[in-house]
Amino acid sequence: MDRILKLLTWPAAVFIAGILLWYEQYKLTGNQGSVWLFTVLSDWLGIHGYEKPFRLGVGTAEIVGSILVVLPWTRIPGAALCLGIMSGAIFFHTVSPLGIDPYHDGGQLFQEACEVWLCSAFILFAYRREAVAMVERIFGIHLPRIA
């Protein structure tokens, strides 16, 4: 069963990279919609005028996550990074003035964030033993064994 789950991480990783890299063209080129979205967020957070570093920082993190999740030897940290980024996206869409449908397109951006989050969580589940071992190695702690 674990072998099948690990094989299924390939399409999940490609899906994650495809979605994240598709939106980079908007974040990194200063697309009007992307600038508006990050301006709303930075103003809501009380850090007025920091739209550009916020937008470029998220975009850069998404590119790094996309690369890491596709490479088999870095899939675990890549999935963890993508899960964290998408957790932030989902959080800000649900609690900030953005809402889940900021572009009035039926909430496509929010839906894709949820899909990327689910694929990232699936990858971490498929590699759960390796992920736990990695955390133990990095932090020098012992975690309870999971099935």
Model regions and ranges:
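Membrane-interface extramembranous regions
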Residues: 1-147
